[in-house]
Amino acid sequence: MTKKQKKMLYRIIAALALVLVLKLLPPLPASVELLLYCIPYLVVGWDVLRKALLGIKNRQPFDECFLMAVATVGAFALGDYVEGCAVIIFYQIGELFQGVAVGKSRRSISALMDIRPDYANIEGEDGKLEQVDPDEVEIGTLIVVQPGERVPIDGVIVEGASTLNTAALTGESLPRDVRSGDEVISGCVNMSGLLKVRTTKEFGESTVSKILDLVENSSMKKARAENFITRFARVYTPAVCYGALALAFIPPIVLLLMGQPARFGDWVYRALTFLVISCPCALVISIPLSFFGGIGGASACGILVKGSTYLEELADTRVVVFDKTGTLTQGTFKVVKVCPVEGGTEDSLVEAAALAESWSKHPISLSIKTAYGKDIDAARVTDVEELGGHGVTARVDGKPVAAGNARLMAKLGLTVPDVPQTGTIVHVAIDGKYAGYLLISDVVKPHSAQAIKSLKQAGVRKTVMLTGDAEPVAKAVSAELGIDEYHAGLLPGDKVDQIEKLLAAKKPKEMLAFVGDGINDAPVLSRVDVGIAMGALGSDAAIEAADVVLMDDDPAKIALAMRIACRTKSIVYQNIVFALAIKAACLLLGALGIANMWAAIFADVGVMVLAVLNATRALYTKNLTQK
């Protein structure tokens, strides 16, 4: 509790004690009783009266403070002092509870996102470390990150090796090993060795700064449910005030005209009860709190949602489109099959190809050298020639070796076998004879198949894969992962056209999400209903372009984000239905004179407390991550 909340708690206790003492006293003169009951009322309710008067002064009277002030002052005017005090006391109890709940949610999110560094260490000429504000550190400055400290600014390690804890950014507990030459991003915690880092960005442009801005501004983009409640309260509160006024005067006037007793006091009491019941606090407070909790819970899992509107749209997503490379696959090439001719060996074929490709920097060449797994003896390789669009030729141990595609083999007068192309084929010829081939492909991520299955379980109707790869490759990956539809051989511009077709084909109330790695995906991310950037740790483009940012490259996080969104939306609608149903029933009973002021207190404070308790569930995602 804050100091202000503790002070309010003491005021509530004091007011309750005074009311109990006054209730136990023998009957007193009416004027004395009024003055005595005004003491506990003002002790706990003065700030409500003050806010109501300020609202009237500013010509914005219709809020919960105005409703409570009119209801309680009216109760005092009717001589119902205990009920008047009870209404204001329990209203303040509800407000206190709501304040504590909201504060707890905000503190939980702040703790989850407590990644802002307080300082950066700069090494002076005498070797001593000076702590400076991260905002003052320029690009290219050498900073020192000691064990236990957060990396304050993005940069490259120039000296040292260590293990980094990235849990605050990715939600993953598995640490990451780094050494000289590796890039590091701000917000990670250095767990072991001392690191010297050359900064590559200013603090304002670093990853931690962008993430903090994203989380802080997430409440600006409100969901449809939030906007509905705001508009509803704007119309609802004045309407119930006029309704209460009509209830207080029209029935007794009609009764008078009919020659029956008017009983003005009874009808005014009903109107005051009507006012207490009608307070919209449960909705106005619990709906934003639910979305706030959902966004905070997602942040704890390394999923950054830029606003409650995207959380709501994610819950309504029924079509998910993937960019293959870097999203469903690792985006790195790997030798997955080695096929030597009869009489040859896999090791000798890989060795010949790796040595021939030893001078090439092409990703295919790098994957072959990785498969070889040994140091390249450059002295064994001579006369290297790289042939654009074909491959390479070289002499290895004095023998001519060629490694490349079928066109290179044809150029050498060699026939190659008919190989089903489910990846990149590198044919190898040694000493003028065909020696076999290597199959190289982009490796599917370990969790991709399960991620697609989880999306189906989360309510996704159709999954689509877009890729620039050839038809056989796209078909094989699609079949392996269980994707419903794929489109192959696409250029970057073709992806936007394909998205337009998918948007036109979906049902009106369905949302379409696109999942990319944030690289060159900005046009597509901005066109779809929900743009999701995966593996955005350190990617400025992804953080800027996407609506939902996954801080690591685990595709399973997409289904988790949808489960969080669906659970949050469910909580929101539970609160709306619950609050409106209880209030509607109590309003009817109050208007009929069946429900008294005590029932009104429950309908207001009780419903608000239960709705806020339900809303705080959105913050906790442990049971969702285990599915």
Cite the ranges covered by each PLM segment.
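Residue-level signature of catalytic and energy-coupling elements of molecular machines
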Residues: A52, D80, A101, A120, ...
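Juxtamembrane helix-loop transition segments at the membrane interface in multi-pass membrane proteins
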Residues: L53-P61, F97-S110, L289-S308, T616-K627
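Membrane-cytosol interface motif
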Residues: D63-M68, S108-E123, A298-K324
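Flexible metal-binding regulatory segments at protein termini and peripheral loops
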Residues: M1-A30, V102, D126-L129, S209, ...
